[in-house]
């Protein structure tokens, strides 16, 4: 399949989920993005009129951003497919993004897994990085966000960062290696 549809709710209580369409061809997407960035680098008009001081750094950051989105999509879609085969009524797997409408500062989880049977939820940030950085956990340490998830989905049992580094634990946050995580959902 070219893409997978995943329903995303802001709350189980209120319903009204939206469909997330996750493209299933990360290699194709990355190839297109890389070609567009290469064309941008070679574009004389862009080079002469763009007010970005360090264009090489801009291109590198754009590439890094694309890789981050692709990693999020891969982990979300593979985790979703895994839990759908286990028990699609028991497990809810999606993304979560809330904000002012929910009475919160903008907060998100790149991956939320809710076990409806055990009445517990797990929140994940997904980062295309091999470094542990405090900023990676800002949503996972936001007490208002954790309370919101606990009230609107199920009590939060664990918060984790999935990244490209070695597994470790800092305070209450587990850092999981992305490759190892993906191997567990296959």
How should each PLM-predicted stretch be described?
Residues 1-109, 113:
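Accessory nucleic acid-recognition modules appended to NTPase machines
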Residues 75, 79, 109-133:
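Conserved catalytic cores of phosphodiester-cleaving nucleases, focusing on short active-site segments
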Residues 84-85, 143-155:
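Arginine/glycine-rich "motif VI" loop of SF2 helicases in the C-terminal RecA-like domain
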Residues 103-106, 123, 130-143:
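Active-site-adjacent loop/helix micro-motif of nuclease/hydrolase catalytic cores
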Residues 103-107, 115-119, 151-155:
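A structural signal for short secondary-structure junctions
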Residues 123, 160-161:
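Structural beta-sheet core signal
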Residues 161-186:
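Domain-level recognition of nuclease-like catalytic cores that cleave nucleotide substrates
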